[in-house]
């Protein structure tokens, strides 16, 4: 039974007074100052806040306290919900970063329907913190039937992907595959590798989504390696392995994410058969991992060989312009939920300059700003540095990746990165390889055995020989010394 509006407001006022007494004035103004009563119906109270961040924080830290206080007002209350004001509980599809999606929200999919899109945190789309159980309606029945594997996130599209020098080649290859359809196979298999938080999953899901959108009855499967292992183990347990394998072989496009997690001899054996079947049948395969195929030491050598037979592209860390664009898009998305939100361009630019890691670190920095902005609206750059010290690591050595050293050295000497990892012993390859090993030892905290593994599985004594060789030469070879200084500067600039 619905409470009278005046009675509801009186109850809410009493509750907020109790809440303020329990948590203190400062915490109350920080977290609950913009809390409003939306509705009291039957046994449920619905409260609202202006941002998803506030909603997530209150739900995670104060849900039990709110329920307890409401039950003191009305023992029939069983549940307190906190929602974002003016936003339907149905998740919107991703919209361009500069505009807000004002279209009427569609009803949520019921549990019986197939197309469910879990939502996490990302730039360029729906706001952070949406629960992974949320759902949107599939655009078509064909799309519903097509995705047989892991769920897709509707925000991960090519339109919401921030491109730049570090990922432009991988993005172009991904678009080509998505647009080619089943009639033409390109770069097969396409292997995209990068460290965590640099957009691999976004790119792979964008391929799957675009392929489904382009071709009405496309048979597209997007899987994480862990999900593949679970599905296959379940199929064996249920005596359904043959049917599962046949289902996967009868597709147009297979997209596999997080290949580094594919474990188990029998599982890898079955995946190898699947990979061979699809490639031999001219079916497109796209794979992503956190390292190059040659460095996936836990994978069966036959799987690695097949993956190396295609095109491998690396996605590097975003540069300053990309980081700034990510922050701008994230702010535009947040402003769709709270129009009063305002973070100055100079603050965004400063964060883009100082937080130089992955997109996830940038997301963490923005979340800090979003949180602080609710009770520090005029935050200064000095205060930003203080808040983000754990991300910027001011005064600490820059984090330099061996893969970046290899890429920059290979480009400088006009050889391929694969040449550096190969067994070729020509002079044009040996010198760049030794230089790259030397720089890896000088500029990273990695051990000699670890560096050796990153250079095609070489022994640590090979790395030690390379380091000593360059040290011996640099004293007498002015040109080499200048090359090393230039390379160090290029590597440091990339890490900046």
Curated annotation (Swiss-Prot):
Region listing for Domain I, interacts with DnaA modulators, in residue ranges: 1-76
Compartment(s) where it occurs, according to its Swiss-Prot or TrEMBL record: Cytoplasm
Location (main, coarse): cytoplasm
InterPro entries membership: AAA+_ATPase, Chromosome_initiator_DnaA, Chromosome_initiator_DnaA-like, Chromosome_initiator_DnaA_CS, DnaA_C, DnaA_dom, DnaA_N_dom, DnaA_N_sf
Disulphides: none
Key words of the record: ATP-binding, Cytoplasm, DNA replication, DNA-binding, Lipid-binding, Nucleotide-binding
Region (Domain III, AAA+ region): 151-373
GO MF: ATP binding; ATP hydrolysis activity; DNA replication origin binding; lipid binding
Record: residues binding ATP: 197, 199-201
Record-annotated membrane-spanning stretches: none
UniProt keyword Lyase, yes or no: no
GO biological process: DNA replication initiation; regulation of DNA replication
Annotated stretches, region: Domain II: 76-150
Domain IV, binds dsDNA: annotated segments: 374-496
Pfam families xref list: Bac_DnaA, Bac_DnaA_C, DnaA_N
Gene Ontology CC terms: cytoplasm; plasma membrane
Record comment regarding domains: Domain I is involved in oligomerization and binding regulators, domain II is flexibile and of varying length in different bacteria, domain III forms the AAA+ region, while domain IV binds dsDNA.
Quaternary structure and partners: Oligomerizes as a right-handed, spiral filament on DNA at oriC.
Protein family per UniProt: Belongs to the DnaA family.
Functional summary from the UniProt entry: Plays an essential role in the initiation and regulation of chromosomal replication. ATP-DnaA binds to the origin of replication (oriC) to initiate formation of the DNA replication initiation complex once per cell cycle. Binds the DnaA box (a 9 base pair repeat at the origin) and separates the double-stranded (ds)DNA. Forms a right-handed helical filament on oriC DNA; dsDNA binds to the exterior of the filament while single-stranded (ss)DNA is stabiized in the filament's interior.
Entries under HAMAP family matching the protein: DnaA_bact (MF_00377)
UniProt protein name: Chromosomal replication initiator protein DnaA
Organism this protein belongs to: Brucella suis biovar 1 (strain 1330)
């Amino acid at each position: 039974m619905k409470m009278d509006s005046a009675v509801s407001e009186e109850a809410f006022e009493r509750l907020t007074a109790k809440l303020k007494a329990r948590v203190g004035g400062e915490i109350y103004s920080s977290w609950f100052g913009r809390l409003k009563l939306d509705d009291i119906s039957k046994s449920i109270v619905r409260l609202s806040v202006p941002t998803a961040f506030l909603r997530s924080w209150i739900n995670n830290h104060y849900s039990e306290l709110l329920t307890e206080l409401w039950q003191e007002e009305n023992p029939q209350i069983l549940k307190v919900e906190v929602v974002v004001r003016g936003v339907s509980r149905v998740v919107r599809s991703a919209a361009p970063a500069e505009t807000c999606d004002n279209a009427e929200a569609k009803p949520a999919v019921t549990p019986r329907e197939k197309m469910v899109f879990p939502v996490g945190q990302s730039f360029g789309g729906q706001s952070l913190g949406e629960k992974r159980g949320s759902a949107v309606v599939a655009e078509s029945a064909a799309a519903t039937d097509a995705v047989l594997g892991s769920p897709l996130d509707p925000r991960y599209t090519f339109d919401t992907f921030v491109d730049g020098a570090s990922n432009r080649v991988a993005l172009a290859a991904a678009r080509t595959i998505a647009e080619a359809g089943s009639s033409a196979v390109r770069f097969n298999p396409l292997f995209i590798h990068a460290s965590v938080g640099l957009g691999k999953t976004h790119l792979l899901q964008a391929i799957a989504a675009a392929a489904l959108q382009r071709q009405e009855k496309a048979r597209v499967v997007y899987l994480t390696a862990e999900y593949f292992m679970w599905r296959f183990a379940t199929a064996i347990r249920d005596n359904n392995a043959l049917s599962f394998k046949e289902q996967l072989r009868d597709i147009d496009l297979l997209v596999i994410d997080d290949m580094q997690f594919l474990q188990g001899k029998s599982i890898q054996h079955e995946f190898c058969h699947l990979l061979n079947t699809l490639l031999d049948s001219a079916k497109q395969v796209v794979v992503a991992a956190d390292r190059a195929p040659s460095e996936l030491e836990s994978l069966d050598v036959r799987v690695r060989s097949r993956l190396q037979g295609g095109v491998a592209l690396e996605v590097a860390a975003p540069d300053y312009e990309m980081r700034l664009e990510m922050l701008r898009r994230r702010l535009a998305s947040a402003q769709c939920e709270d129009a009063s939100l305002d973070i100055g361009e100079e603050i965004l630019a400063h964060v883009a300059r100082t937080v130089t890691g992955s997109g996830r670190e940038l997301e963490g920095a923005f979340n800090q700003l979003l949180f602080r902005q609710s009770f520090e609206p005029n935050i200064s750059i000095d205060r930003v540095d203080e808040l983000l010290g754990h991300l910027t690591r001011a005064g600490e050595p820059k984090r330099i990746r061996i893969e970046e050293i290899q890429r920059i050295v290979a480009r400088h000497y006009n050889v391929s990165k694969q040449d550096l990892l190969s067994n070729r012993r020509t002079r044009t390859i040996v010198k760049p390889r030794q230089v790259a090993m030397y720089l890896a030892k000088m500029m990273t905290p990695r051990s000699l055995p670890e560096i050796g593994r990153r250079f095609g599985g070489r022994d640590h004594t090979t790395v030690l020989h390379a380091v000593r060789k360059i040290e011996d030469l640099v004293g007498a070879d002015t040109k080499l010394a200048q090359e090393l200084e230039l390379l160090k500067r290029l590597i440091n600039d990339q890490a900046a």
